[in-house]
Swiss-Prot record:
This is ER membrane protein complex subunit 6. Belongs to the EMC6 family. Part of the endoplasmic reticulum membrane protein complex (EMC) that enables the energy-independent insertion into endoplasmic reticulum membranes of newly synthesized membrane proteins. Preferentially accommodates proteins with transmembrane domains that are weakly hydrophobic or contain destabilizing features such as charged and aromatic residues. Involved in the cotranslational insertion of multi-pass membrane proteins in which stop-transfer membrane-anchor sequences become ER membrane spanning helices. The lineage of its organism: Eukaryota, Fungi, Dikarya, Ascomycota, Saccharomycotina. InterPro entries: Emc6, EMC6-like. GO terms for biological process: autophagosome assembly; phospholipid metabolic process; phospholipid transport; protein folding in endoplasmic reticulum; protein insertion into ER membrane by stop-transfer membrane-anchor sequence. Coiled coil: none annotated. Component of the ER membrane protein complex (EMC), which is composed of EMC1, EMC2, EMC3, EMC4, EMC5 and EMC6. Keywords: Endoplasmic reticulum, Membrane, Transmembrane, Transmembrane helix. The chain crosses the membrane at residues 24-44, 49-69, 88-106.
Length: 108
Protein backbone atom coordinates (compact mmCIF):
# COMPACT_ATOMS: atom_id res chain seq x y z
CA UNK A 1 0.00 0.00 0.00
CA UNK A 2 1.41 3.40 -0.92
CA UNK A 3 1.77 6.16 1.63
CA UNK A 4 -1.06 8.17 0.01
CA UNK A 5 -3.44 5.24 0.41
CA UNK A 6 -2.40 4.81 4.04
CA UNK A 7 -3.04 8.49 4.77
CA UNK A 8 -6.46 8.32 3.07
CA UNK A 9 -7.32 5.19 5.06
CA UNK A 10 -6.38 6.94 8.31
CA UNK A 11 -8.40 10.06 7.43
CA UNK A 12 -11.41 7.98 6.40
CA UNK A 13 -11.24 5.72 9.49
CA UNK A 14 -14.52 5.13 11.29
CA UNK A 15 -13.52 7.14 14.37
CA UNK A 16 -12.56 10.14 12.25
CA UNK A 17 -15.74 9.98 10.16
CA UNK A 18 -17.85 9.85 13.35
CA UNK A 19 -15.97 12.85 14.76
CA UNK A 20 -16.44 14.77 11.50
CA UNK A 21 -20.18 14.01 11.53
CA UNK A 22 -20.43 15.29 15.12
CA UNK A 23 -18.76 18.55 14.15
CA UNK A 24 -21.01 18.94 11.11
CA UNK A 25 -24.08 18.20 13.23
CA UNK A 26 -23.08 20.91 15.71
CA UNK A 27 -22.74 23.45 12.88
CA UNK A 28 -26.07 22.42 11.36
CA UNK A 29 -27.92 22.37 14.71
CA UNK A 30 -26.63 25.80 15.69
CA UNK A 31 -27.39 27.21 12.26
CA UNK A 32 -30.93 25.82 12.18
CA UNK A 33 -31.74 27.29 15.59
CA UNK A 34 -30.28 30.70 14.73
CA UNK A 35 -32.05 30.74 11.35
CA UNK A 36 -35.32 29.85 13.07
CA UNK A 37 -34.95 32.61 15.66
CA UNK A 38 -34.10 35.17 12.99
CA UNK A 39 -37.07 34.07 10.86
CA UNK A 40 -39.32 34.44 13.89
CA UNK A 41 -37.92 37.83 14.85
CA UNK A 42 -38.37 39.04 11.27
CA UNK A 43 -41.96 37.74 11.37
CA UNK A 44 -41.45 35.62 8.25
CA UNK A 45 -44.55 33.52 7.61
CA UNK A 46 -45.66 30.49 5.63
CA UNK A 47 -43.73 29.26 2.60
CA UNK A 48 -41.34 32.20 2.81
CA UNK A 49 -39.97 30.80 6.07
CA UNK A 50 -39.30 27.41 4.55
CA UNK A 51 -37.68 28.99 1.50
CA UNK A 52 -35.54 31.06 3.90
CA UNK A 53 -34.47 27.85 5.63
CA UNK A 54 -33.74 25.90 2.44
CA UNK A 55 -31.63 28.64 0.88
CA UNK A 56 -29.60 29.43 3.98
CA UNK A 57 -29.27 25.79 5.09
CA UNK A 58 -27.76 24.90 1.72
CA UNK A 59 -25.59 28.03 1.74
CA UNK A 60 -24.19 27.11 5.15
CA UNK A 61 -23.48 23.57 3.94
CA UNK A 62 -21.65 24.94 0.89
CA UNK A 63 -19.62 27.27 3.13
CA UNK A 64 -18.79 24.25 5.31
CA UNK A 65 -17.57 22.34 2.26
CA UNK A 66 -15.48 25.28 1.02
CA UNK A 67 -14.07 26.46 4.35
CA UNK A 68 -13.79 23.37 6.54
CA UNK A 69 -13.44 20.60 3.93
CA UNK A 70 -11.43 22.82 1.55
CA UNK A 71 -13.49 21.59 -1.43
CA UNK A 72 -12.60 17.96 -0.68
CA UNK A 73 -15.48 16.54 1.38
CA UNK A 74 -14.72 13.04 0.09
CA UNK A 75 -11.62 13.02 2.27
CA UNK A 76 -13.69 13.47 5.42
CA UNK A 77 -16.99 11.69 4.68
CA UNK A 78 -17.76 8.32 3.15
CA UNK A 79 -20.78 9.67 1.26
CA UNK A 80 -20.29 13.46 1.24
CA UNK A 81 -23.49 14.53 -0.53
CA UNK A 82 -25.70 12.37 1.66
CA UNK A 83 -23.80 13.05 4.91
CA UNK A 84 -23.69 16.83 4.51
CA UNK A 85 -26.96 17.71 2.81
CA UNK A 86 -29.51 14.97 3.48
CA UNK A 87 -28.70 12.86 6.55
CA UNK A 88 -29.84 15.35 9.20
CA UNK A 89 -32.22 17.45 7.08
CA UNK A 90 -35.42 16.51 8.95
CA UNK A 91 -33.70 16.97 12.30
CA UNK A 92 -32.60 20.46 11.28
CA UNK A 93 -35.94 21.52 9.84
CA UNK A 94 -37.61 20.41 13.08
CA UNK A 95 -35.20 22.54 15.12
CA UNK A 96 -35.74 25.42 12.72
CA UNK A 97 -39.53 25.27 13.07
CA UNK A 98 -39.26 25.08 16.86
CA UNK A 99 -37.00 28.15 17.02
CA UNK A 100 -39.08 29.91 14.35
CA UNK A 101 -42.30 29.58 16.34
CA UNK A 102 -40.53 30.58 19.56
CA UNK A 103 -39.04 33.72 17.99
CA UNK A 104 -42.35 34.55 16.32
CA UNK A 105 -44.21 34.21 19.63
CA UNK A 106 -41.69 36.44 21.45
CA UNK A 107 -42.14 39.30 19.01
CA UNK A 108 -45.81 38.76 18.15
Amino acid sequence: MSSNEEVFTQINATANVVDNKKRLLFVQDSSALVLGLVAGFLQIESVHGFIWFLILYNLINVIYIVWICQLQPGKFYQSPLHDIFFESFFREITGFVMAWTFGYALIG
